[in-house]
């Protein structure tokens, strides 16, 4: 570790084969036929139910995005009003400070 700039620089690279396998497991022929048969059993009702569920989820997501958009727009309007209000208060405080300075004699009347 003497020649390393950061801790861990001297570590060896981990081979990718430790994380995943590049070969698919071979399935027995008997199970393969059962899987194909199960896939054929999907009738139109289950497909319609899947499509209906998917449509509900998409509708729900679009509704949430619309609500987020409205909320962001409302927050933008409120922020704009607050910024204008802060600027108005700043200008009023400066004029009040000038008025107090004139009345106390610290500054001549302009």
From Swiss-Prot:
Recorded coiled-coil stretches: 36-101
Subcellular location: Virion
The keyword DNA damage appears for this protein: no
Annotated consequence of substituting residue 51 to A: Forms only tetramers, no hexamer
Keyword match Phosphoprotein: yes
Pfam families (alphabetical): Vac_Fusion
Record-level GO BP terms: fusion of virus membrane with host plasma membrane
One Gene Ontology term, aspect cellular component: viral envelope
Keywords: Coiled coil, Disulfide bond, Host-virus interaction, Phosphoprotein, Virion
Function: Structural protein involved in the envelopment of mature virion (MV) to form the wrapped virion (WV). The wrapping consists of the addition of Golgi membranes to the mature virion. Participates in mature virion (MV) movement within the infected cell. May play an indirect role in MV-cell fusion.
Similarity comment: family membership: Belongs to the orthopoxvirus OPG154 protein family.
Quaternary data: Homohexamers, covalently linked. Interacts with OPG144 and OPG153.
Record-given protein name: Protein OPG154
Record organism: Vaccinia virus (strain Western Reserve)
